[in-house]
């Protein structure tokens, strides 16, 4: 996602791999705080799926962090931090986790995020993910006693829960209950409805060619500064387009001419380290 963290990431990447000479001068960056802008991004491989539970593909993971959100994120030091959660308590010698959702969480379809959505999402994810299978073996119950409370009761302590729920690959993303319950964990979701800072523009999606996202106007960032996948993610462009350009030389030329703004994998011979 293009947020304040992404801006810092961009600067770090510039130091490592800016195009030299006139090429660097031609690099078209999205304006921060200026007129309405579109960021055009070229991923390293085609975006074939939008279900981060179904696949561990890097492109799916990356777009997933724009569309979806997690109960826990990770800061830049890889420490898990509450993300969709207002807070949590661990009781009964580590065998009872009570997690409280933040208020004002909304899905892109206009429905409020409720604890039962998160319970259904976690149950689908646990059937697909190896770490989730470990959690199933230790679990007594996973319930939603009210709209904002997720209750996990365990047979024995599992202190690594925040680390597990904040991981990147086959991430435990939150989706509406109807989608989580209605989708086999071993099949792809047919809808890409999350609660993240960007909403997916399904009518513009062309598999293997083009995808687009726009800011979600009901997304409420956390108060903390953004730090990797945790903290307050604030959108800084008005539209993001993923443009698939399989040929590396063609992609490099598109960057030089200003047709695109960002290559995930620039050609090494065009980079200066």
Question: Where are the predicted features?
Answer:
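N-terminal lobe/hinge region of extracytoplasmic solute-binding protein
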Residues: 42-92, 123, 193
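Aromatic- and charge-enriched surface segment that lines or borders ligand/interaction sites
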Residues: 86-131, 145, 151, 242, ...
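Short, solvent-exposed loop/turn elements at domain surfaces
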Residues: 48-53, 79-81, 160-163, 207-211, ...
């Amino acid at each position: 996602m293009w947020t304040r963290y992404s801006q810092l990431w961009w600067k770090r990447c510039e130091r490592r791999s800016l195009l030299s000479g006139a090429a660097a001068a031609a690099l078209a960056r999205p304006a921060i705080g200026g007129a309405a802008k579109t960021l055009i991004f070229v991923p390293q491989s085609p975006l074939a799926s939008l279900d981060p539970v179904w696949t561990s593909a890097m492109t799916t993971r990356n777009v997933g962090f724009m569309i979806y959100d997690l109960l826990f994120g990770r800061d830049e030091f890889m420490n898990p931090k509450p993300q969709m959660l207002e807070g949590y308590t661990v009781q009964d010698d580590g065998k009872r986790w009570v997690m409280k959702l933040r208020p004002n969480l909304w899905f892109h379809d206009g429905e409020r995020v409720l604890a039962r959505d998160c319970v259904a999402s976690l149950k689908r994810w646990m059937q697909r993910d190896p770490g989730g299978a470990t959690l199933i073996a230790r679990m007594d119950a996973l319930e939603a006693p009210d709209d904002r409370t997720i209750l996990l009761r365990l047979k024995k302590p599992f202190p690594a829960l925040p680390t597990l729920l904040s991981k990147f690959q086959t991430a435990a993303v939150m989706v509406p209950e109807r989608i989580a319950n209605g989708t086999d964990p071993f099949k792809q979701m047919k809808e890409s409805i999350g609660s993240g800072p960007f909403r997916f523009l399904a009518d513009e999606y062309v598999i293997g060619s083009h995808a687009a996202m726009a800011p979600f106007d009901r997304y409420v960032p956390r108060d903390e500064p953004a730090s990797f996948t945790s903290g307050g993610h604030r959108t800084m462009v008005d539209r993001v387009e993923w443009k698939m350009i399989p040929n590396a030389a063609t992609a490099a030329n598109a960057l030089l001419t200003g047709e695109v703004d960002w290559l995930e994998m620039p050609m090494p011979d065009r980079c200066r380290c």
